[in-house]
UniProtKB/Swiss-Prot annotation:
This is DNA-directed RNA polymerase subunit omega. The gene is rpoZ. The RNAP catalytic core consists of 2 alpha, 1 beta, 1 beta' and 1 omega subunit. When a sigma factor is associated with the core the holoenzyme is formed, which can initiate transcription. GO terms for biological process: DNA-templated transcription. InterPro entries: DNA-dir_RNA_pol_omega (IPR003716), Pol_omega/Rpo6/RPB6 (IPR006110), RPB6/omega-like_sf (IPR036161). GO terms for molecular function: DNA binding; DNA-directed RNA polymerase activity. The keyword GTP-binding does not apply. Keywords: DNA-directed RNA polymerase, Nucleotidyltransferase, Transcription, Transferase. Promotes RNA polymerase assembly. Latches the N- and C-terminal regions of the beta' subunit thereby facilitating its interaction with the beta and alpha subunits.
Length: 127
């Protein structure tokens, strides 16, 4: 890909994993935000390469990009409890037709099961 650009970015952001996360975030921002004038100049390159080049050139504020990433990952609304009493009863009613299955700890209940490999042939379980 852009090895020279990634090596240049390592001078600014020494941790590769952090670099990948921040460059990905900035590339997504390039795709979603309106920066058409700047992107048209670099039209032949894709957003990940553009973001790496801008990070290497120091055109991107790394602390601000980190803060933007953290803000995007935060949950902004409270999550309701996943299980309501009414909903759990409805789920039980929907699955009443399914047979109850018990598998013992020694898995002896599976001895009479048929296992088929990817060729459609039965596995030999006596081996």
């Amino acid at each position: 890909m852009a090895r020279i650009t990634a090596e240049d970015c390592n001078k600014i952001i020494p941790d590769r994993f952090r670099l990948v996360v921040l460059a990905t975030r900035y590339a997504k921002l390039l795709n979603y935000k309106v920066e058409t004038n700047q992107i048209k100049k670099e039209k032949r390159d894709k957003p990940p390469v553009i973001s790496l080049r801008r990070i290497a050139a120091g055109k991107v504020s790394v602390p601000q990009l980190e803060q933007d990433l953290i803000n995007s990952l935060r949950t902004r609304m409270m999550i309701e409890p996943l299980i309501n009493q009414d909903e759990s009863e409805d789920v039980e009613e929907k699955f009443e037709y399914l047979p109850e299955v018990y598998i013992g700890e020694d898995y002896s209940d599976l001895d009479d099961q048929i296992f088929i490999n990817e060729n459609g042939e039965d596995y030999e379980t006596d081996k």
